[in-house]
Amino acid sequence: MEYKFTVDNFEAEVLQSEIPVLVDFYADWCNPCKMMGPVVAKMAAEFEGRAKVGKCNVDDNMTIAQKYRISSIPAFVIFKNGEPVETFVGAMSATDFKKKIEQAIN
């Protein structure tokens, strides 16, 4: 299941999560973000139960993007125990994306 993270649920769904969380910081107008959409959805299904995977629209949730210094998108931040532990930016293959997630959550 792909989550939608907002200022209203970020604390509960991401920072207080008992499992790792991958947040895809994106914008609707961003073409590389659109390219990564299906990859993120696939990873949400593949990592179900092991990690939460979801999106955070930077235009609608600027305070979150600013807090984590998101300046380029798509940006992917993996949180463990409420802290960012890995950040990577830009479009990539599903294989590379999966490897980065696996390395960060294991």
Regions found by a protein language model. Give the residues of each.
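Proteins that catalyze or organize thiol-disulfide redox chemistry
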Residues: 1-52, 59-106
